[in-house]
Amino acid sequence: MKRLLIFCFAALLCSAGASAQEPNYALADQFSAKKVGNMVFSTAIRPNWFKNSDKFWYEWKTSEGTEYYIVDPVAKTQTKAFDMERLAMEVSAIVKDPFDAKHLPLRKLELKDDSKFTFEVQSTEMVEKKDKQKKDDDKGDKPKGKPQKEKKIYRFEYILATGKLVDVTENEEEKDYPMWACISPDGSKAVYSKGFDIYWMTIDDVKKLMEDEKDSTVVDHRLTFDGTKDFYWGGSNYRGADTKDTTKRTANYVLWSPDSKRFAVTKYDMTKVKDLWVINSVAQPRPTLQTYKYQMPGEPGPVDHLFLFDMADGSCKEINIAAYKDQDTDVLRRTMKNADRYDDWRKSVWMGDNDGFYMIRRSRDLKRTDLLRVNVAEDSAHIVVHETLNTYVETRSPRFVNGGKDLIWWSERNGWAQLYLYGADGTLKRQITDGAFHVENVLAVDEAAKVIYFQAMGVDKNENPYNGHVYRIGFDGTGIKQLDDPGFNSNSISFSDDAKFFVSNFSRVDSTPQSALYDGTGRKTPLQEADLSLLFAAGYKFPTPFKVKAADGVTDLYGYMYKPFDFDSTKTYPIIDYVYPGPQVEGNSEAWSRGFTRTDRLAQIGFIVITVGNRGGHPNRSKWYHNFGYGNLRDYGLEDQKYAIQQLAARYKFIDIDRVGIHGHSGGGFMSTAAILEYPDFFKAAVSCAGNHDNSIYNRWWSEQHHGILEEITASGDTTFKYSIDKNQDIAGNLKGHLMLVTGDIDDNVSPSNTIRVVNALIRANKRFEMLVLPGQRHGFGDMNEYFFWRMADWYSEWLLGTSHRDQVDIRELNND
């Protein structure tokens, strides 16, 4: 009998040991953000278009170093801008520091006059820090100390036609216009703020301040006199009471008329918008309080007042734009051209002409949106286009064509995002695009050919509906044609100013990123393919795409599965669902990215990690799909996520349906906590980061838009707004699994109060859980992301694999990174 008991006890020990799977921290450690950064280089081209032609240049880095290319689309050529070996030798001879072709850091590389490059190179030579020393000496209130030193910066010009390198270090350096100056299109004057009012000065005085910021001869011409800290001129909405130095010149948001005679500006009344706070406990020398304006759902909002200034006499008048209580307005800005980037200052010009401009007006519940025209000779605005929906109206900036006589308007009025042609007077002329697909935006317009170029998803029903493609179509709605490659997602697109050519960066999560040049008819010239050779050499493998059904059994959902790179199909693995509920985007990406810490890298610990969409998630499908969660913002996506996991477990034997985890950040933090509380017998572990668990205290814009707010008009005619929503803390008593809550303590996006309220409810429900507060970190966790990763790895390893490194005080992987 004794012998039998010993045998049984030994068998139990063996069984317990077999049930635990050792987490593979070493494999995950190989793919830290820092290490991946040394294996993956350029993944997309950012074309820098020439000012006066369709040429462009770009930078491209691989494991062989960095090269710079000039592309001539007309001549169909791609040439290297520099002979890097020769350039490195010439720079070394001047700077007196050794460089080679693979190690030549060019700083501030810019094209000037389409004929030469300018750039800087930092040397190891220490020189006196002239500007700083001069300022300190000018103060005169401190004894002169040792001259401050800095590394010398050499400045160069490289002449394209001759390949000649010119050292211009000793030449007087061109100074940039100050950031506070909103300069008129004709370059004669600048508008800015001091304190809470608006001022202007001549451009000559601006230039004086560029030479000496204490020049006493400059004149500040004051335009307004009634600004206060909560009712101020020309700032951004919600800036509120953060201006402490009322003598300092600061930027304001004004938009000029094309002829520089007038400008429009909004004055924001923030007196009823309440403050919110965070305390930075690790600030030195003592903790600091940050106060900022933060409107929560149902609370009073800012009131926008639109003014038009006439620079001939400095007069202003208010434009009557009132239509809805707590409405939101935006004066539209002229679309920037590539050539504008070469100007000495960024031109802030309104969308319209010298006689008037256009703006958007939205009701607070976002069910009504107007495109307005404001004529400078009048005191009120005219409705051009009026949109209504029972959920909420979204818009895109219109494109004016035919000399401003017509406009291209984006609308979801028929359940899909489509393009419409309107007359400038508001007459609907025709629907341009027509079909069960989503038009994301207008990319370019060729007015001479009367062709619109746009990006759309879901046109080809045989493709993943999230794949974005470039199309062309005539103003009359005919001749629609796809221009880029099928089967990929064009996620970054740049057109030449004349709309004759475009560069597309395209990929999928399971393919290497590529870049190509196309002309307006779709003729393709390949440019680059990302160099992932070092990543693959380290063992990297692409994730696997999949398609499942939503819980309704009808709607298709799309996702990706991330496996350990040492995956063994004979084993079983826990599954972790990385989630973001939407509604502005879903957790699953459609383009390859090096930022895969919470998916690919997490899988290396020993998990199957998935991302999958859910009804109510992504806006790039139908309006029905996007608005599915309207009015049910806490729970709308949970059932689909659970059902997707169940389908995958039935499809793949290596998934252990009894070991399910869930993880998310921000909206995903909110969703992952809701999931483990709503389905406590299904989800066994969750890590929820920076979650907006209580959307009644999250920002009004996101919460009211995606959940809805009730607008009521009383018998006396007053308008009130009521907001009610289910919160995670309401169901804290349901917790059975293992929940880890994480927040930065100075998160001024999603207040830490969201997490604290869930913590409070869990404590009062007598629940065990984990809480991690990251000191001095905002919404994205900053330089503590790597620390967070290993704490997350510990949590899932402990509760899904059965063992972890939580018993080790030192995180060795962090010490070795």
What are the roles of these predicted feature ranges?
Residues 1-4:
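Positively charged n-region of N-terminal signal peptides that target proteins for export
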Residues 6-7, 619:
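General helical structural elements
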Residues 7-10, 20-492, 498-501, 507-513, ...:
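Beta-propeller folds
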Residues 14-17:
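N-terminal signal peptide c-region/cleavage motif recognized by signal peptidases
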Residues 47, 275, 345-346, 354, ...:
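Serine-hydrolase catalytic core recognition
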